[in-house]
């Protein structure tokens, strides 16, 4: 009987153990875990708990939740950051200056006009233009008239054969321009007017050689220089000699 009782108890225990494998928490009640872990907590009670001071958040607004339509395509670790629309706190203002520069002309509502600084604008090279400051010319009317009188053509500009050059001189600093635009240094030839030529021809027929006083008087009457009258008479005598030679050969 003892053997049969032992076997029956063995079979009963094996059946009960197999059935209880599916639910292991039922085998050990929750009271055992609580009683076993309580001594562990009691061992660390002699150390004081650490107290940390709460710090201000760096950014004003918290992380916004991800939209449902975009959460499916992004991994679970990714947290998008949406720029807050509100005014940041005073502690984080210095961190946002490089992110969002404030306009130059605007100032904080608490500041006065002393904080606003008008910055000059760069115009042409070497010039500074200020905003909102009109420019006034200090030039007087007398100075303007003097400048205009200097720019007006004078009597010397209307003179005939005043020694103006053929064309404007090229750039003296550029040797290639001097070589390409090389011209003679002779002055521009100023022809005499018909009236001047007629009067000189009359004087030449009357006398081929002029005295100094007569040359001075003719130059004054015809608005010419004495040198011009002298050269004209020399050329006219050479032309007359040439015509006489041609007539003698014929």
From Swiss-Prot:
There is a cross-link at residue 117 (Glycyl lysine isopeptide (Lys-Gly) (interchain with G-Cter in SUMO2)). It is found in: Nucleus. Residues 21-47, 149-182 are annotated as: Disordered. GO terms for biological process: anterior/posterior pattern specification; cell chemotaxis; DNA-templated transcription; embryonic skeletal system morphogenesis; mammary gland development; positive regulation of transcription by RNA polymerase II; proximal/distal pattern formation; regulation of transcription by RNA polymerase II. Keywords: Developmental protein, DNA-binding, Homeobox, Isopeptide bond, Nucleus, Phosphoprotein, Transcription, Transcription regulation, Ubl conjugation. It holds the Pfam family Hox9_act. Residues 185-244 bind DNA. InterPro entries: Abd-B_homeobox_TF (IPR050803), HD (IPR001356), HD_metazoa (IPR020479), Homeobox_CS (IPR017970), Homeodomain-like_sf (IPR009057), Hox9_activation_N (IPR006711), HXA9/HXB9/HXC9 (IPR017112). Its main location: nucleus. The keyword Signal does not apply. Residues 159-171 have a biased composition (Basic and acidic residues). Sequence-specific transcription factor which is part of a developmental regulatory system that provides cells with specific positional identities on the anterior-posterior axis. PANTHER family: AGAP004664-PA, HOMEOBOX PROTEIN HOX-B9. This is Homeobox protein Hox-B9. It comes from Homo sapiens. The gene is HOXB9.
């Amino acid at each position: 009987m003892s053997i049969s009782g032992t076997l029956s108890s063995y079979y009963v225990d094996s059946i009960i153990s197999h059935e209880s494998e599916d639910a292991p928490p039922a085998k050990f009640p929750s009271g055992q875990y609580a009683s076993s872990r309580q001594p562990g907590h009691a061992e660390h009670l002699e150390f004081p708990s650490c107290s940390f001071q709460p710090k201000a958040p760096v950014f004003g607004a918290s992380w916004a939740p991800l939209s449902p339509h975009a959460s499916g395509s992004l991994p679970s670790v990714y947290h998008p950051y949406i720029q807050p629309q509100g005014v940041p706190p005073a502690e984080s203002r210095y961190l946002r200056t490089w992110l969002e520069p404030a306009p130059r002309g605007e100032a904080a509502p608490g500041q006065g006009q002393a904080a606003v600084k008008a910055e000059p604008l760069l115009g042409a090279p070497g010039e500074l233009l200020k905003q909102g400051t009109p420019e006034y010319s200090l030039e007087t009317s007398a100075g303007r008239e003097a400048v205009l009188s200097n720019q007006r053509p004078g009597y010397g500009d209307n003179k005939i054969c005043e020694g103006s050059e053929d064309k404007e001189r090229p750039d003296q600093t550029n040797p290639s321009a001097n070589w390409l635009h090389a011209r003679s240094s002779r002055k521009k030839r100023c022809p005499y007017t018909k009236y001047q030529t007629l009067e000189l021809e009359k004087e030449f027929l009357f006398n081929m050689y002029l005295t100094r006083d007569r040359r001075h008087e003719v130059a004054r009457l015809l608005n010419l220089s004495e040198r011009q009258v002298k050269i004209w008479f020399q050329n006219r005598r050479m032309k007359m000699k040439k015509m006489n030679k041609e007539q003698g050969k014929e």
